Structures are given as structure tokens and as C-alpha cells.
Amino acid sequence: MKWLEIQVTTSQEAEEAVTGILYDLGAGGVVIKNPNDVKELAQTSEWDYFDPSLLEEGEEVKISAYFLITTDITDKVNFLKERIWELKSFGINVGNVKVEVSEVDEEDWADSWKKYYKPLKVGKRIVVRPLWEEYSPKEGEIVIDLDPGMAFGTGTHETTKMCLQFLEDIVKPGAIVFDVGCGSGILSIAASKLGASYVYGADVDEMAVKIARENVKLNGLENVEIFQSDLLKNFRGKADVIVANIIADAIIRLIPDVLPHLKEEGLFLASGIIKDRFEEVKERAEEFFEIIDMKEEKEWLSILMKKKG
């Protein structure tokens, strides 16, 4: 299938606003190429390998949006230009805007993001390696092979990174781990490779379940079971660790149901909490749990809890 690619070159400041306009116009997908993201990672120890040419991209942001080819595409492009121009009236510096339109195959845009997804070291030992990249692990490193497809969880997002860092410290040999809202399966796979005896991962989304199962198979793991479930609904038994990297509303709904599924000395790790919702989540969590540790990165928080008493 052919799609129409509309690529907008704009400023760092206007990135979020322009992306919102493209989604409002009905974009079927958006790829954002922001050189600052690359530079930020390159200055840390988290990205062991990257293409140095990515550092030569300048300061402009390129936002590519993909639309089904229709007769009104000219109207969409004109409307887009008008909306971007209007951003100036709100005091947003849009930079030297350029709008380019081209036809692309579905396979091309679906895979275009892969060139920017490289092996990533998270925490002390875990390295997330995309399926299409070569990587030679250093001594003591734990490599997770991953093809995230359309499921959430590549290791690059702050919420996933914080979960992986916590799991390095709390998953003990022989542990039973529940991964609620498993997405790509990255946390389930990490728990297994960190020594868990058995891991149960579930997601409400059928596509995520399919992708997670494929990633478990890709890593050659036989002690990870992936299934479909709305939060803890289809889980059985108790776990030493329950991890949920989901949105704040889902965490609030999940919290009371964690207790009967958690062993007496077990730990509950909740992530995906935006700063603006933290107090709300914290208040609900403290009705049932004692918060023993927290991590914060940019606008996201992760909290580690144990049963009260």
C-alpha cells in the first residue's frame, strides 16, 4: 500500500505543537527525528553504540507523518501550513519551516524508525539489542534481544529504563515475577535473565501479546508465559515481584488487586507515572503499601512498594 509522507522541518520549540497538528489532521503514524535526543544519549553511558553521523544533523527537528492518499491531501497540506504559521502568534518560534510531500511504501515508513534504535545499556548490566543490530556483550552484561514492533517497551523510554534498573536490584534467583501490561515483553524477558524461576506477563492488547511472545521466543526463554489479561484479572497465584509499567489511571485501578497476588515479603513496582499525577497515585498506593524507593527521570516517576506492617 502507498502512503503519503508529509515531512515538516521545524524548531525544537515547535516539535510538540507541530506533531499535535499532524495527528489532528489524521496521520496514521509519526516519526520524529530530534538531534538533541541523540546528543543527550551520546553524552551518557547508556548508549554503547551509535552511528556518529547522527551527531551531525544540526539543530532542526524533522517530523514525518504518514497519511492515506486521498483527494483532499492538498487541502491538508495548506491547512498544515496555516496552522504552523499561527503558532507564531502564540509566541512559538517555529524556525525555518519546510514542508515536503512524497509517496512511500507502507514497509518503508513502518521500518524507518529502526535506523535510530541502537543497542542501549540500561542500568548496570542490562543491554537492549534491537534484532537487526550487531552487539558484542562485555563481561557480566545481560543482553535482551528485542523487536518491539508496534508494542510499547524498547528500553529507551524513561519509564521502561527505570523499571529495568529497579529489576536489576530486586529480582532474586528463583523469584516469581508478574509483569502487568507487558507491552513488548521487555520487562518479562529481563526478569527471566536476571534469575527469576518463572515469569508471567500479560497485556490487554492482542497485538502486544503476539509481539511479546515472539520476543520471548527470540531470547530462547522457556520460563516466561505471555497471555492476554486486563491487569491482574487472569493471573493466578502469588509473586515475589509484581511490576506494572502502565499509565497512572490503570495503576490506581490496579493497586487494591495487587495485595492478594503478592507474597508477604513481595515487592510491587509501579511505573509510567507522569509527575502531574504522582500525588494522586501516591495517595492511593499508601492506603495499601509502604513506599520504600523511588526513581525520577524527566517528567516520569517509578515507585517501589512493599506491604504495610
Swiss-Prot record:
- Listed GO biological process terms: methylation
Keywords from the UniProt entry:
Cytoplasm, Methyltransferase, S-adenosyl-L-methionine, Transferase
Q: Where in the cell is it found?
A: Cytoplasm
The chemistry this enzyme catalyses reads: L-lysyl-[protein] + 3 S-adenosyl-L-methionine = N(6),N(6),N(6)-trimethyl-L-lysyl-[protein] + 3 S-adenosyl-L-homocysteine + 3 H(+)
Q: Which residues bind S-adenosyl-L-methionine?
A: 160, 181, 203, 245
Q: What is its EC number?
A: 2.1.1.-
Example GO molecular function: protein-lysine N-methyltransferase activity
Signal peptide (from-to): none
Which SUPFAM superfamilies does the record associate with it?
S-adenosyl-L-methionine-dependent methyltransferases
Looking at the UniProt record for this protein, which Gene Ontology cellular component terms does it annotate, in alphabetical order?
A: cytoplasm
Q: Check the record and name the InterPro entries matching this protein.
A: Ribosomal_L11_MeTrfase_PrmA, Ribosomal_PrmA_MeTrfase, SAM-dependent_MTases_sf
Q: Does the keyword Transferase apply?
A: yes
One Pfam family from the UniProt entry? PrmA
Report the protein's function: Methylates ribosomal protein L11.
> What family is reported?
Belongs to the methyltransferase superfamily. PrmA family.
What is the name listed in the Swiss-Prot or TrEMBL entry for this protein?
A: Ribosomal protein L11 methyltransferase
The protein's gene is named prmA
